[in-house]
Swiss-Prot record:
Residue sites binding ATP per the record: 691-699, 715
Domain notes: The CRIB domain is involved in the interaction with CDC42.
Bias-annotated ranges (Pro residues): 496-505
Keyword Ion transport (UniProt): no
Family membership: Belongs to the protein kinase superfamily. STE Ser/Thr protein kinase family. STE20 subfamily.
Composition bias type Low complexity, residue spans: 313-332, 371-411, 456-487, 559-583
PROSITE patterns: CRIB (PS50108), PH_DOMAIN (PS50003), PROTEIN_KINASE_DOM (PS50011), PROTEIN_KINASE_ST (PS00108)
Tagged with keyword ATP-binding: yes
Taxon lineage: Eukaryota, Fungi, Dikarya, Ascomycota, Saccharomycotina
EC class: transferase
The protein's name: Serine/threonine-protein kinase CLA4
Quaternary organization: Interacts (via the CRIB domain) with CDC42.
Amino acid sequence: MTSIYTSDLKNHRRAPPPPNGAAGSGSGSSSGSGSGSGSGSGSGSLTNIVTSSNSLGVTANQTKPIQLNINSSKRQSGWVHVKDDGIFTSFRWNKRFMVINDKTLNFYKQEPYSSDGNSNSNTPDLSFPLYLINNINLKPNSGYSKTSQSFEIVPKNNNKSILISVKTNNDYLDWLDAFTTKCPLVQIGENNSGVSSSHPHLQIQHLTNGSLNGNSSSSPTSGLSSSSVLTGGNSGVSGPINFTHKVHVGFDPASGNFTGLPDTWKSLLQHSKITNEDWKKDPVAVIKVLEFYSDINGGNSAAGTPIGSPMINSKTNNNNNDPNNYSSAKNNVQEANLQEWVKPPAKSTVSQFKPSRAAPKPPTPYHLTQLNGSSHQHTSSSGSLPSSGNNNNNNNSTNNNNTKNVSPLNNLMNKSELIPARRAPPPPTSGTSSDTYSNKNHQDRSGYEQQRQQRTDSSQQQQQQQKQHQYQQKSQQQQQQPLSSHQGGTSHIPKQVPPTLPSSGPPTQAASGKSMPSKIHPDLKIQQGTNNYIKSSGTDANQVDGDAKQFIKPFNLQSKKSQQQLASKQPSPPSSQQQQQKPMTSHGLMGTSHSVTKPLNPVNDPIKPLNLKSSKSKEALNETSGVSKTPSPTDKSNKPTAPASGPAVTKTAKQLKKERERLNDLQIIAKLKTVVNNQDPKPLFRIVEKAGQGASGNVYLAEMIKDNNRKIAIKQMDLDAQPRKELIINEILVMKDSQHKNIVNFLDSYLIGDNELWVIMEYMQGGSLTEIIENNDFKLNEKQIATICFETLKGLQHLHKKHIIHRDIKSDNVLLDAYGNVKITDFGFCAKLTDQRNKRATMVGTPYWMAPEVVKQKEYDEKVDVWSLGIMTIEMIEGEPPYLNEEPLKALYLIATNGTPKLKKPELLSNSIKKFLSICLCVDVRYRASTDELLEHSFIQHKSGKIEELAPLLEWKKQQQKHQQHKQETSDTGFA
């Protein structure tokens, strides 16, 4: 199939004599007049004489049988369904054995064999010369059956077309390859719109040796290249075209290898236990597993690699990656990441979920150089204000060219200089037009400087005096760490000059990628009031003070994280607008500087602790981004701004979409405050020991001090360390709204400060089902298994009736108490289905318990929990889930391909439990049982018992407690 023959290319034109010297008819024309006069000879292995008067050139009964060489490698054959587009036959599909040879397309009622003596079996029922094919129209997802693929052969004489339906997609592609090989000049595509010899699944190029070019259809001899060699015998004519078959990612059945694989995928396959037999068995499943793993590391799941991390930047699905950049070290890191992905997230590995990047180096863009330079001066030497505006002009001219990496977000702010407040601009993109923006900024700034000089000549002396007074006042504010309106105004206004920010922010904050606090919106409102003061002549400074008090007052109620997100959502500090409103901004308000500044001091005291915290974060943000958004040349405090454009450029569109879909920090804090208790929980509880960890935090055993030392479980979560904070709110809301005897009871929740969350739950003394299985030597009888499944099913039924999917059912998340009660916990991955979205398609959970539809990235519903319950049942039978000893990539492949896992010793189990497993682990979701059906199953109805019968499983726990108590008493006696 990889050879192209001159006779195939030029059957529709005058052809040279064949190698055996037989005279060719040579009368066939490309017009396809319907005379049926093609070349009368072919290769030695095939002879075709078309004698029918049919306008198609097709004969139903040949006077001379076609001689077939069944073992020829140039032949594609197989069973298909055929019909034409006639009025009476368009609804009938006839099953035929189709064979494409060098010259004809033949259809047989039965498979032809050259070895038997029956000549009728080798007589085609229908024969179609290849030179009469005008084009081939693809009709995917249509045909004889629902899974069939079809294509239409259109003849040149505008007669009836032939529709051919192929059963499988692989056969469909093979046939298209065969037609591409035999008829390279025939157009193949949907609705005759495709390019020559192409179909939607393949990218095919024909590389000629020089003579065959785009004008080959008009030149009768253009198809004959210098490399064409005529040979005798059965080999025919050698191929004049170097045929290449390129696909994005494909599988070559001949070699048994994948084609077009990215280097990262190749490395994963080489280091995995997926064998060549696995590849040949189901190559589509291998590709699905690789895509699944890539999406997990691309941030599509809760445990995925975060945005902006180096892991994502090295993925092959990014548009800007280079396959040559993949090294073995990176591949090893990705393997290790896959190994870590199946483990519960530990607090020590939290840093891998944060975007890590180095702080950009100076020089900074033009309108930010003065800010950064003055900020460093201020930090190191308590600061000093420039003596005149000339310094600003000099620095502006010096740094005017340093705008190559300025994001359009900053330039957009300069375009709207006269607007004090506006909606958040779009996410920053590549700053390719920075030069244009910088030139415009320079022109606008030059015009503004001239205008300011004209209006301020008369007040220069007063300005100098006020500046000295302002500096003294600023030093006082620095010692008190006041909350000044650091986001807006020029440095010439004492109201807008903040204290020196301490440089105690550790550099690790910048590297960890934490979003820093930004108190922007209260000051934004203050600036609006100030601008109104400037624009209205009848407004005095007291009105500005009142506005400042009014808008700063609620600021104390907001947390650091809410301010952080607001800074990223409203990255428009009004200092640039304030500075460029009018010259009165920098000079006209000097007389009111005392009254403007003093009212701010009383507000600073209650906010002082928050401000101390945020000042460090602002320092780290400056180190992280290296770019500030305000063009004010002397403002020393405009640091908490939107992120720099550098890291944002590396984000893919998919990641940005995920970011927009997530709750921002302000919404998260607001939502948390409606759920949690604002009381300090530390005086209420006494932590005893660490009990374990879940998907979103550590769990501690504690005692309630005011409730007779009642034992409870406290789940502590650091909000700053959570990659997706909305999952935490999701977990709290589900537990709070899902009060059930088979779900771990939610007691209360507390938010300490602005980043530490405590969730109080009932304590399950028996521990997890995993511990019970391990400490009982994997000897759970069927009655105990049925009882645990029964209790778990009741909890799942309650969730599913609320249209909630747990999505992480496994033995680690099923707990028992001292009385044998079985309860479900860890709702960090749960999801709620709605009428608008009654199926999910995200990839969360633990791989070994995942349903096949999740691994294959198909839509799923509540029945994924039923599959996980079946895997958990196998855990109780065999001590571990299937494929646990396989490395994760191979396990994902086996889940996707094997379907229902096999039991190690099924002969030891009863029929009822095997039937129970069969309907839990049914690959076809339509036939998989629901929780309601499972509760009515005979295994649950007849085998399950009372929860008290589970008490023997907890004997190991009692023995462990006695041993610890004895050890404690011994140690106390020794000290005594």
